């Protein structure tokens, strides 16, 4: 009845991780809203907005709406702050495992 927690691999090669996320985000627009970032990361909308408010994730405020350029999202996804989060989303863990096996 107990679940075994397997820790995801830590992102060692930032350049490879950056190329991985660039390939994953290639189909998305260059500037996206919070909903697209939520869909991609698997984190709650409030969490993503909190990252923006405290300055961890850079975003543009446009008509009372946050817009996130793809390059800012990739910077955040490759950051130590993001990858050292204690409570990772399932999608975050899956992407870390996939990035480890990924070849460009």
Question: Over which residues does each language-model region extend?
Answer:
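N-terminal flexible/basic segments that precede or flank functional cores
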Residues: 1-17
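A short, Lys/Arg-enriched interface patch at domain edges and termini
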Residues: 2-5, 73-104
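Polyanion-binding surface elements
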Residues: 17-47
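Short helix-start
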Residues: 33-35, 58-82
